Amino acid sequence: TFGVATLGFRYKNFKAEGSVFTGREPDENRYDFDKARFDSYSYRLSFNPTENWVLQFSQGFINSPEALEPDEDVKRTTASVLYSKKINMDKHFSGAAIWGLNDKGVDHKEHSFLLEGNYQFMKNAIYSRYEYIQKSKEELDLDNGFPGERFNVHAFTAGYNRQLISFNNIDLNVGTQLTVNGVDKDLQNLYGKTPVSFQVYLQLRPSLHKH
């Protein structure tokens, strides 16, 4: 978005932040600057009970984010729990549970949920992820006569990657992952019952900071 101003406050293990920003998503002309309207706002609260845990809650009140639906505002709510543990110099585990809700009114509320974990050992990592999301008929570009208003989509991913080289605090990794999807029964004629995807990838990322 174009135009964001944020103010934060920290006290011991608590942190509070507030932001004002432009609710409308950028237009199709990606090479210019849209007008900053500062017509939306959000707040976020977080708490670190220990050095390993982070608890977070946030809400955003977004004014007319979609150009095709200019009269619809969105209240977005999120909550998350993050965990990170350094087991020893060569082993590290991290995990996350994240929930979100887009609320456009009584008949248009869409939930999402993410649960993932990553275990890093030496130059190797194994990870898994579960994703759940609700999609509306409009987002899936379905006809008005299509049965149902919201549709549940699930995805289960398992993967492995290995560091090939590291230079200037940047790691180059190679990895592979498999994803199995669970599709709402009303969508199975379009997408199948359990679509499966397989991926091999190269990844550039910052090196893990070591104390």
Predicted regions: what is each one?
Residues 59-68, 72, 91-112, 125-159, ...:
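Outer-membrane beta-barrel translocator/channel fold
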Residues 30, 69, 140-142, 186-190:
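Outer-membrane beta-barrel and related beta-rich outer-membrane complex signature
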Residues 158, 192-211:
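Outer-membrane beta-barrel "beta-signal"
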Residues 7, 16-18, 45, 55-57, ...:
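Membrane-embedded beta-strand positions of outer-membrane beta-barrel proteins
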Residues 9-17, 51-57, 88-95, 123-128, ...:
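Repeated loop/turn-to-beta-strand initiation elements of outer-membrane beta-barrel proteins
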Residues 11-13, 20-26, 59-65, 85, ...:
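Transmembrane beta-strands of outer-membrane beta-barrel pores
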Residues 14-66:
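Loop-centered beta-sheet repeat module
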